[in-house]
Amino acid sequence: EGERVLPAIRGMLNSKEQLEQTAAAIRGLDCGTVRIGTFTSVAVHWLPGMIKRFQSEYPKVELKLMNGDYHDVEQWLSDGSSDLGFVALPTKQRGRVTALLEDRLLAVVPVDHRLASLPRFPIKEVENEPFISLLETSDHDARRTLEAAGVKPNIRYTTKDDYAIIAMVEQGLGVSIMPELLLSGRSDNVRIMELTPPASRTIGLCLPDADRAGPATARFAQCVSDWVRERYSRIQNTTS
């Protein structure tokens, strides 16, 4: 019985928050609460910079981060627990979805691995190596890539923790495939290799009800798009 009324209660709370944000905007007060669904790589490498910029312009807006895996974020968006969320494309989630970045998938292998000296890691070799995987509900990127290549991984270990995978590879327990964003800026004792054939994921931002989003939510969504565009245009200009 309680589960049946929960969506209605969440809907009323969301409408109340949107009304409060709109009233605050009319008064010239940029306040309210924005609930952000996110996964690890974005939470670690993107959101701190995005939040810093957003709070410098809208210091009265409260931001609540909800960290999980792809499945968690889509569930939060569906049931109204999050106002907006980062998703991997393509997504079944309804609403306004904006593609932000194509993020390469890379092989993570022990430094003394027999294939570590190659210029690229052949995806088919995953069949011959102990493979360390995220849980099935979390590992859409690697599983999609392997299925597309017709490769059946020799899954030896599974975990929900991205960084636990890196630590296990470091100890020589197996190999894995992970997004470049997640691996950036780390100094682990592992070898990061491009895949052959190459593979990637696309990170997007979803507003499940963009037409009814409160002003603070809409402004944060715009901040996200601007931040990603400026950050990666600077990187391209630096490397070109």
Model-derived features: positions:
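Short, well-ordered beta-strand segments
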Residues: 33-37, 85, 108, 132, ...
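Beta-alpha-beta core module
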Residues: 93-104, 118, 163-212
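Hydrophobic residues within well-ordered alpha-helices
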Residues: 2, 36, 77-78, 126, ...
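Hydrophobic hinge/microswitch elements
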Residues: 69-74, 78-82, 88, 137-193
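Central regulatory/effector-binding core of bacterial HTH transcription factors
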Residues: 29-93, 152, 159
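Secondary-structure junction motif
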Residues: 129-149, 213-221, 228-237
